């Protein structure tokens, strides 16, 4: 007989109107002014439980929502809900205790998102930790490469990266992220080599910018011989401003990495799992990395690796406990992720993201033609964005979209607005979002 103390009747029924007050009593709660209704919300319709207001979601939980809210293949499938509840009752340590649900997830992940060139998988909870472990792969690899070549194995301590990058907020990643001083100031960081990001933007000679960045990279390799373990980059810089790069730049960085015995790592935490119209953004760039960090839409975060990693026979994927965590991700997330990936596969949502993204970008081109304030419409798949004249103007537009149009958007970079809808978004829903943006731009002037 259970002796657990149960709450008195009604104590568990916290009114939605009190949510922000309860949270603010113990933590900073400065997010959206709504209370997500976990039952009433559907697809890209996010409902405020306080008053029933429905918002059109172009935010997608920071690009982590793959199918939108309460997709029927999950919410209306009794067998799946039972499976999910069973997995949620306990939290086994996946790193050492294996289960059928875990194996089904890994098998599905490899089938739907896997790359035969990157056969090694490692799962962990959080995109930052995914990047951290990608870096640990490179640190270990470079040290062993140095040792095998008769060089000092203590060398191999630096990471080459780009300006305006976001790779996380803890540990090693704090030394890479440089989008917003608020997120990194006053925290100790490593002085690692940073090169200018030669992204495509109006008025820039991008080939000249690439040459400058490549010269900086060559100088970094020369200044730190055999000490740079990898070059890490987002294929499209997300938080930094939806910055796109030419494939030629990454191809030449790959050549530099080969020349100087360093790995190439892509951080696809935001760009991965179909958002750009392919499983991974790098598949549109003609360059296969040695390690890929993933997260957000995949629900379970982690890394895929292969390529030059396997040139070291005792790499971290072969030596027990070199990289590890208690839960190795999260079994409940794995069950949900497996079903999400099955839906993505069955409904061909990655192909759909590409087609819908083409339509969205065309609408954004039209928006730029109609409004002088809108510049640089850009995107791959559903990962699209525009730029406005100032940060203040952008902020007013985003606020009015939420308050008047009931559309949720997210800022990007200093002056941009980004689209991050779920893969299930329809053309009609994208049109509704762009129409709301059109009306708002007509009403809110720079």
What do these predicted regions represent?
Residues 2-446:
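Conserved N-terminal phosphate-binding loop of PLP-dependent enzymes in the Aspartate aminotransferase
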């Amino acid at each position: 007989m259970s002796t657990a103390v149960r709450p008195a009747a009604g104590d568990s029924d916290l009114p939605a109107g009190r949510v922000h007050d309860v949270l603010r009593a113990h933590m900073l709660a400065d997010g959206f002014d709504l209370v997500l209704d976990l039952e009433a919300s559907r697809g890209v319709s996010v409902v405020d439980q306080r008053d029933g207001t429905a918002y059109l979601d172009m935010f997608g939980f920071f690009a982590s929502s793959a199918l939108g809210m309460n997709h029927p293949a999950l919410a209306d499938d009794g067998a799946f809900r039972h499976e999910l509840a069973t997995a949620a009752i306990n939290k086994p340590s996946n790193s050492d205790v294996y289960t059928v649900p875990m194996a089904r997830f890994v098998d599905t992940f490899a089938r739907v998102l896997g790359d035969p060139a990157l056969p090694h998988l490692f799962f962990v909870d959080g995109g930052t930790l995914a990047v951290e472990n990608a870096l640990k792969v490179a640190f270990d690899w470079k040290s062993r490469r140095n040792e095998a070549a008769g060089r000092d194995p203590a060398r191999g301590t630096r990471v080459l990266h780009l300006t305006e990058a976001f790779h996380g907020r803890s540990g090693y990643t704090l030394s890479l992220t440089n989008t917003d001083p608020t997120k990194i100031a006053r925290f100790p960081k490593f002085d690692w080599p940073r090169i200018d990001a030669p992204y495509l933007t109006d008025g820039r000679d991008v080939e000249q910018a690439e040459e400058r960045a490549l010269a900086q990279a060559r100088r970094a390799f020369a200044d730190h011989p055999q000490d740079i373990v990898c070059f890490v980059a987002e294929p499209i810089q997300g938080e930094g401003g939806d910055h796109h790069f030419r494939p030629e730049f990454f191809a030449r960085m790959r050549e530099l990495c080969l020349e100087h015995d360093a790995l190439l790592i892509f951080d696809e935490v935001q760009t991965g799992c179909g958002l750009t119209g392919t499983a991974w953004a790098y598949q549109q760039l003609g360059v296969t990395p040695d390690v890929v960090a993933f997260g957000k839409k995949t629900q379970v975060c982690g890394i895929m690796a292969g390529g030059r990693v396997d040139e070291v026979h005792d790499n971290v994927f072969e030596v027990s406990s070199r990289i590890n965590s208690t839960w190795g991700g999260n079994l409940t997330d794995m069950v949900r992720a497996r079903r999400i990936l099955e839906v993505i596969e069955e409904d061909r949502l990655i192909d759909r993201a590409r087609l819908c993204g083409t339509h969205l970008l065309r609408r954004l081109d039209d928006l730029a033609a109609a409004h002088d304030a809108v510049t640089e419409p850009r995107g791959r798949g559903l990962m699209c964005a525009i730029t406005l004249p100032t940060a203040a103007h952008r902020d007013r537009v985003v606020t009015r979209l939420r308050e008047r149009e009931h559309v949720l958007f997210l800022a990007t970079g200093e002056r941009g607005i980004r689209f991050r809808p779920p893969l299930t978004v329809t053309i009609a829903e994208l049109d509704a979002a762009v129409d709301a943006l059109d009306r708002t731009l007509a009403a809110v002037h720079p």
